[in-house]
């Protein structure tokens, strides 16, 4: 989990805490290991991809159609480090074990997900427009709760959208799921129960 809010205007720590709580209360929590990197820099991205080798890369922070904003190695609020969508995709690709899913929990990031699934990962999720911070947090917590309970990628995505709808929010359709042609989100389950030995 990469979180970046160089200007301090997003509740990245709250999102990471909610995701951790959702996973820790799930059925298959023992099969999930979280690598949480608040104030994430581009070094954290590359280090996490190559060392931790995650099945899922989660980014929460600022973005738009063409870029993602990481933090700089500064202790004061700053404008961040701009990373192009292409450079981000190249970073995700720069490993022998690329992740299965990238979730960009940031504004207007859905424009980047088609290229990710065309070139890098089987599944990607992004936001179709600007999304309120609380809505993004609620979507992510519900999505990961469903994943950790053994639901398919598609069902987890739908559960996250329904969470927003049940909360009476207008942004339920903002989270967008894309997938490569050779995979099926309705049958892909990222967390399965282990067979007792």
Set out the residue ranges of the language-model regions.
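A domain-level signal for caspase-like cysteine endopeptidase catalytic cores
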Residues: 1-85, 115
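Active-site proximal helix-loop segment of RNase H-like, two-metal nucleases, encompassing DDE(D)
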Residues: 139-151
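Caspase-like cysteine protease fold
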Residues: 78-97, 148-197
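Catalytic cores of nucleophile-dependent amide-cleaving enzymes
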Residues: 59-142
């Amino acid at each position: 989990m990469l979180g970046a809010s160089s200007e301090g205007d997003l509740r990245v720590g709250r999102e990471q805490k909610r995701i951790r709580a959702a996973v820790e209360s799930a059925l298959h929590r023992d099969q999930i290991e979280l690598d949480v990197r608040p104030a994430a820099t581009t070094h954290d991205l590359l280090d996490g991809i190559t060392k931790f080798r995650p099945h899922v890369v989660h980014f929460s922070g600022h973005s738009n159609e063409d870029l993602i904003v990481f933090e700089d190695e500064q202790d004061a609020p700053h404008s961040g480090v701009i990373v192009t969508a292409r450079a981000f995709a190249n970073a995700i690709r720069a490993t022998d074990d690329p992740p299965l899913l990238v979730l960009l929990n940031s504004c207007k990031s859905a424009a980047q997900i088609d290229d990710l699934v065309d070139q890098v990962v089987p599944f990607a999720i992004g936001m179709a427009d600007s999304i309120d911070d609380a809505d993004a947090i609620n979507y992510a917590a519900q999505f990961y709760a469903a994943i950790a309970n053994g639901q398919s990628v598609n069902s987890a995505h739908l559960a996250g959208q329904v969470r927003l709808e049940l909360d009476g929010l207008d942004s339920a359709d903002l989270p967008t799921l894309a997938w490569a042609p050779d995979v099926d989100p309705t049958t892909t389950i990222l967390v399965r129960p282990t067979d007792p030995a």
